[in-house]
Amino acid sequence: HENKKPFDIVEMSYGEQVLWPNHCIQGSMGARFHPDLNHTRADVIIRKGSNPAVDSYSAFYENDKVTPTGLHGYLKNREVTKLTLVGLATDYCVAFSALDAEKLGYAVTVRLDMARGIDSDGSLNAALDKMSKAGVNLVNG
């Protein structure tokens, strides 16, 4: 985005989009799993954010709100009904995932002690309020 800097907001075909500093770039160290995470037992790894034209906060949908990641179908096929979410960032990826999961009918808990927010201009409290009002269970420990 020419003449733009990180945290500027631009209008995309799907709505407003925050321009984030480069992070989790495919093939980079920042996109790798932590070395202490044993992902060899994982049945599936859902990748998101790989379309350069559409950002992806939620684990369930791209930011266009129509392109699924495949996670809902995967969980539905396994009759999963309850989810506990952790990670980064509480006020963006975790919140968008929690809200989408709630809309899709899951019982959702967010472990706040295992998540960290960006908290740009009150975004963390706004996200916590939105999740709470949507029925997401917010817990510490």
Language-model region placement:
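Active-site alpha/beta core segments
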Residues: 1-82
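Short, well-ordered beta-to-alpha junction loops that form the rim of enzyme active sites
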Residues: 48-49, 87-89
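Histidine-anchored nucleotide/phosphate-binding helix
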Residues: 92-105
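A short glycine-rich beta-strand->turn/loop micro-motif centered on a GG-aromatic cluster
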Residues: 84-87, 107-119
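Structural recognition of alpha->loop->beta junctions
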Residues: 32-44, 119-141
